[in-house]
Design a protein with these regions (language model features):
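N-terminal metal-binding scaffold of metallo-dependent hydrolase/deaminase domains
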Residues: 1-38, 386
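Active-site gating loops and adjacent loop-to-helix segments of metal-dependent hydrolytic enzymes
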Residues: 81-92, 135-161, 204-244, 284-318
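His/Asp/Glu-enriched, well-ordered alpha-helical/loop segment
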Residues: 230-246, 263-275, 281-369, 373-376
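Divalent metal-dependent hydrolysis catalytic cores, especially in the metallo-beta-lactamase
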Residues: 61, 77-106, 121-134, 161-172, ...
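Metal-dependent enolase-superfamily TIM-barrel catalytic cores that perform enediolate-based chemistry
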Residues: 107-129, 136-197
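Conserved, mostly hydrophobic/aromatic
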Residues: 48, 128, 183, 213, ...
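Active-site core of metal-dependent hydrolases
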Residues: 159-285
Length: 392
């Protein structure tokens, strides 16, 4: 079947364009042509809305009562379905620090869910957020389960789970540089996270294969003072080196001025938005479990903010990707109005994560790309979602 999208503001790599027809055949974008030349087919009239590539979430733990570490098929399928309704068409399920048996159950469920995932955001491999972190920056992770990134700890994971596309680790812990080199050799993303490292150590990590900073600013060292001297941390290394930067643009983790600074200093081609969304996403305030239901840690949600039980820090987010784009667009546009910031905010939610994940057919409206297409208005209220040319 041929789909023909018309009447929209098309978010193309070269900018926002109107008066076009986007033609979809066999699940892929076949052509983008003047609307007057549109072929016969099922028309999708955007009615003046934005026509955008589907959003790509590189860092998401679940939602709607499920955590991927629950180790069930439904723990993957239901969040995939629900996140898709908010514009996410591709996601990399993320596993927080856990026991190795919990990892085994979670990956087995991922494999079982893959062929069944026909109505949700497509899976793009697994992100291990842990267990190779600094205890000083464990945050909402289970510090009792942290391990050193030594070959005897990471090789069993890499050899058993070819689905791994990214591992987040603290570069200052013993063995981290070797882990970075091994991940780079295997084509797996090595990311700096939950770290108390100095700027110098993070710059060394960059030379040893680390290319991404996980939830920038969060559980991450920055300028500190010892005696009368000041020392730069991981945040400063993120600016000084060509790291890609991941931010949780939910309006809670980072204020607008920091979002603007990240955007201006790194640019939309180096910044990726992520939800870091957890089990409580889509649910009311209350008490929940982070990680597997059997072995996870308790956390609370108050006024839509996920917190550790002592309320001393955040515990992930309950955001969806449409909220990220809306928040970032508003932050970077300022007085120009939210809609003015949408093109670059969308780039940070589409083309940039597609490049980082190595998905050349995702994240762009261009001939040959997958027909993962969403429609939304000037407030980023998503109205229609197509994955592989099929509406969900």
């Amino acid at each position: 079947m041929t789909l023909v999208f018309t009447g929209g503001r098309f978010l193309l790599p070269e900018g926002v364009r109107t008066g076009l027809a986007l033609v979809v055949r066999d699940g892929r974008i076949d052509a983008i042509i003047p609307e007057a030349d549109a072929p016969e087919g099922l028309r999708v009239d955007a009615g003046g809305q934005f026509v955008s590539p589907g959003f790509i979430d590189m860092h998401v733990h679940g939602g709607w009562g499920h955590d991927f570490l629950d180790g069930t098929v439904e723990a993957y399928l239901e969040p995939a379905r629900q996140h898709a309704l908010h514009g996410t068409t591709t996601m990399a399920p993320s596993l927080a620090t856990a026991s190795y048996p919990d990892y085994e159950r979670a990956v087995r469920a991922y494999r079982e869910a893959l062929p069944l995932n026909v109505s949700g955001a497509r899976f793009a491999g697994i992100h291990f957020e842990g267990p190779f972190f600094s205890a000083a920056k464990a945050g909402a992770q289970d510090a009792a389960l942290l391990k050193l990134p030594l070959p005897e700890n990471y090789l069993p994971l890499l050899e058993a789970y070819p689905e791994i596309v990214r591992i987040s680790a603290a570069p200052e812990v013993e063995g981290a540089m070797g882990l970075g080199e091994e991940l780079q050799r295997r084509g797996i993303i090595a990311a700096v996270a939950h770290t108390d490292a100095s700027c110098a150590v993070c710059e060394e990590a960059f030379r040893h294969g680390y290319s991404l900073m996980t939830h920038f600013y969060c559980a991450m060292s920055t300028v500190s003072k010892r005696g009368y001297s000041r020392y730069a941390g991981a945040v400063e290394a993120g600016y000084l080196q060509d790291f890609d930067i991941e931010v949780i643009a939910d309006g809670v983790h980072l204020p607008d001025d920091l979002l603007r600074m990240v955007y201006r200093l790194k640019g939309p081609d180096r910044v990726v938005l992520c939800t870091d969304s957890i089990r409580a996403t889509g649910l009311p305030d209350g008490e929940y479990i982070q990680g597997s239901l059997e072995n996870g840690l308790k956390f609370i949600v108050e006024n839509g903010v996920a917190l550790r039980p002592d309320r001393g820090g955040l515990a992930g987010s309950v955001a969806t990707t449409d909220r990220l784009v809306r928040t970032m667009a508003r932050a970077i546009a300022g007085s120009a109005g939210l809609a003015a910031g949408i093109p670059d905010a969308v780039r940070m939610m589409t083309a940039t994560p597609a490049r980082i994940l190595g998905l050349p057919a995702k994240g762009r409206l261009a001939p040959g790309c997958d027909a993962d297409i969403i429609l939304f208005d000037d407030t980023v209220a998503v109205s229609r979602v197509f994955i592989g040319g099929k509406e969900i």
